[in-house]
Amino acid sequence: MAFDKKLLDIVACPVCKGKLEYDKTTQQLICKADKLAYPITEGIPVLLENRAVPLTESV
């Protein structure tokens, strides 16, 4: 199941409530403010703080 980009208009980072960006390559939603990546599983964003992955300098 593909991620629906229209969701970006209504979802927000659960930590800072900021805008998320979709990374098609890694299938993650990225919060640049908190430097966190949230996984997308079977087209569904997992917006749980304990499932977020810290971004590295290379991302």
Swiss-Prot record:
It comes from the Bacteria. InterPro entries: Trm112-like. Pfam families: Trm112p (PF03966). One of its GO terms (cellular component) is cytosol. Belongs to the UPF0434 family. HAMAP family: UPF0434. PANTHER family: PROTEIN PREY, MITOCHONDRIAL, ZGC:162634. This is UPF0434 protein Sbal_1685. The lineage of its organism: Bacteria, Pseudomonadati, Pseudomonadota, Gammaproteobacteria, Alteromonadales.
